[in-house]
Amino acid sequence: LLRLLPAYEGHWDELRDASGALREPWREFFERLGDVGIARLEDHRASLAQQIRDNDISYNVYADKGVPRPWALDLLPFLISEAEWAHIERGVTQRAHLLNAIVADVYGPQTLLQRGQLPPALVFGHPGYLRPVKGYTPPGGQFLQVVAVDLARTPGGDWTVMAHRTEAPSGLGYALENRLIVSALFADPFRALRVSRLAPTYSQLIATLVQAAQATMRHDSEGADRSPHIALLTPGPFSETYFEHVFLARYLGVTLVEGKDLTVRDDKLYLKTLGGLERVHVVLRRLDDAFCDPVELRADSSIGVPGLLQVMRAGNVIVSNVPGSGFVESPALHGFLPGIAEVLLEEDLVLPSVATWWCVRQTAVGHAFARMDDAFIVPTWPVAARDAPPGVEQGRQRLAAWRERIEAMPDTFTIQQALRFSCTPRYEEGTIGRRPSVLRVYAIADASGGWHVMPGGFTRMAAERQATVSMQYGGSSVDTWVLSSQPTSTFTLLPSPIQPADLARKHRTVSSRAAENLFWAGRYGERAENNVRLLRLILGSLEGNDAEAMFPTLVELALYCGLVQSGDMSAPHSPQAFERALVANLSESTGTASIGQNLSAQARSNGEVRGRLSNDHWRMILAARNDFRDALQELMPAPGVGGAASPGEGNGIAGTNRNDRSNGSGNANGATNCCGERYDRLTLMDALEHLSVQLSAISGAQGDRMTRDEAWRLLFVGRHIERVSAMTSILRIVADHGQLATPAGFDLLLQLFDSTLTYRALYPGRFEVPALLDLLVIEPTNPRGVYGVYERLRKKLDEIAVAAGSTRHRPFAELMAPVASLPTLESLCTVDESKDYGNLMAVCDQIGTYAGAAAHEISARYFSHASTIASQVWS
């Protein structure tokens, strides 16, 4: 039924022995599978791909600019016999002991350095060695809780250690997801072969972290019975392995956090939530060492936690693994491990390392140079912006050039023997092919200082016609089965089926970061809607009969909303220059209040909480941004696309100056180059109409497709703040220019408030200011009526305060004047001696101030958790 493709020449064949017979594990596997199972392999492959799509398993590739691609998983598992695994287990356990002892010695007595077993230059020159950690000893002396060891099988069939991963070992989540998918497809062989289970390993990891956390809880006021709070610290959605972080946190039952979610207070670490600060006792980090703490490590890190190392040194948090453990990942260390093992463990290495020569050692490098046509040159430590060193396929001329570089900077280079990795079988549409593979095995520390090796691992397979085994270069993964002769445990951390009696309304913890991103997503979306509506109206009004009279009003509205920059309109201007400035300021590269920038910022904020959005909702958001970008490229040459603003970054309507600009790329001269004959107003109007429909769809999805928790309420609070601020400012500007009672001003307000149809239905053929103000200000059922939006804002704020359970702050309703106390319609229609609507303008200013102050108070109360500033803001 299957055609067997030949293995790579000179490589160990995992499937067949030298005589061509199937090796024992594979013989058993295919016997258990049977002819029927083999005939269904193609169906299984399709099912596997469907499960990956359904589960949205992805892997971000840097070369794709952070665009996630579907996870690459091969159908057939990688099989390891019980006897062979016992040897691997002993070797990996020994390595984990050894690496932990090296880290402890380097940050402690430094005996290895003093005795010359470990060159100081190799340690102190490595960016993974962190001086702020010197002298720190974690509880129990356990620096490493998770160690990953990459193994490859040589052509002779022996296992060799290729690399260690101690900084932030990846793959634990993917290994588990691989197991869940593949074991379900091959359920009968999985049971019959008694494949060892992975769940006890993850249970051991949690038990280890919980035990380590006890030392951080000794001074807790909550009591000794309280469970420690464990958080998995991720770089965020742009990490290549972000899916794994989400999946692993959910499986382990720990909180997934980013650096912005955490804060340090009084040498303790806290998670910022809407309900207040929650103590964090253990951080299982997925960040590289240098990015963990911008105060003491990389100052440019925006993904770390300021002050984290100080909390760690104070003994109030366990960080796993300890920052600074990355130096033992250096490939040059392999050459020194045999001697170090003899000193620290009084043992020989069970698993040998790949032959390695650090180029500083002259005796070794001479031997290595003689073999450079059969070796790889690798960096001794991570260095950015360096072209990749060549491997064996580069040719002698290329190698000679690298030899000169090595002689100039010997400490930065290490030479390793090139190994021909064993070839693992893979299913390829009716055939069994083989690819080079590397096995990653994980060791988990226990509370007594021992190690538990996960019976399985994360096998990676090279891409077609590739010798390098890497997921970044198009490789794939394989589920790893360790066979056993004994019955295996059925223990699992997966949740058991829920029974009706078990159901309860579970409260979902809302982090401050998630809430803040949704808050700003609402604000950016509302800004975009307001600006699109205003721009369509302005472009349609510039050639109308009232264009000249309305021109100053339109210019001020555009300046306020950020459609043009103040510098564009500082000189005497004409409608033509105004229009050119409007068109020149559309893209996201021209300023933080442009339509393009608001769309980009909306996508960025929603992307930070991608897990809360349905697929359709997320696609709408991306389509709105991308379609508008495409339309602008057709309309005029694009000056470049900038990045989206972060939450809170940019110019807010409420409480901030919308006209402040970071650059002048959207000046009038630039607009002249973009407009003229090439500018097609009809094309732009079509694009704006299309965008308006898309934004309405996004708004509908927000109201109909999202869980209505505190974070969702904050999204709509953000929209209400922007809406009431915009509506009051528009009313004030139109009234200030004396256009409130003119037909053009009347029509302008009805369109901007999206109330034309309602007004005509209520007051057909009549244009009277009292009727207008009643609809736009007083009427509570008008979705854009000022008083109605303001009252809904007050109620939403108090709903959030009640849901968050905070008693430290005054209710928002007490800080914002009730609608009943605001001016009546009769008062709003009063005209003073200067023919101004003074009361109307005053209440617009008052409500705008309340909205701006509410935005500041929300930030202090729920996002930054600073001391309340209400007493200052609301006075």
Model regions and ranges:
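Alpha-helical transmembrane segments and their helix-helix packing motifs
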Residues: 54-143, 154-156, 166-218, 226-230, ...
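N-terminal low-complexity, Ser/Thr- and acidic-residue-enriched intrinsically disordered segments
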Residues: 1-83, 87
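Polyanion-binding catalytic cores of nucleic-acid enzymes and NTP/SAM-utilizing transferases
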Residues: 371-374, 384-396, 400-405, 424, ...
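ATP-binding N-terminal substructure of ATP-dependent carboxylate-amine bond-forming enzymes
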Residues: 2-24, 145-146, 153-160, 164-345, ...
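Active-site nucleotide/adenylate-binding loops and adjacent lid/helix of ATP-dependent enzymes
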Residues: 85-106, 119, 125-130, 244, ...
